[in-house]
Amino acid sequence: MKLLVVLCCFFAVYSLAAAQGGQEEFQIKVRICGRHLARTLADLCPNVEYEDVMKRSGARSPALYGTVGWPWARPGAARGKRAGVADDCCVNSCTMDVLLSYC
């Protein structure tokens, strides 16, 4: 319920700012994390469901590590750090345009 109120306030202020076209354009930045971020994306993006956003990658089988010849390697150890919606909207503040770009 709190999230709905926050989103309504966010959209109201965003709409007021967009309505003043002759003045300098500004965008409100918000910081949203965790389940609130997932719920917001699910609400903003019509083709994304909350359960899909909250799913994590499936566990990898330890038996696979030996097949590539690196039994000491951990899953994901070779992957670099990827920036994503959590970096854009939780670590840093993001605008409505940034949120919509993840739809």
UniProtKB/Swiss-Prot annotation:
Chief location of this protein within or outside the cell: secreted
Spell out the InterPro entries in the cross-references: Bombyxin (IPR017097), Insulin-like (IPR016179), Insulin-like_sf (IPR036438), Insulin_CS (IPR022353), Insulin_family (IPR022352)
The name this protein goes by in its record: Bombyxin-related peptide A
Note the superkingdom of the native organism.
Answer: Eukaryota
Q: In which tissues is it expressed?
A: Located in 4 pairs of medial neurosecretory cells in the brain.
Oligomeric state and partners?
A: Heterodimer of a B chain and an A chain linked by two disulfide bonds.
Which family does the entry's similarity section mention?
Belongs to the insulin family.
This chain's source organism reads Agrius convolvuli (Convolvulus hawk-moth)
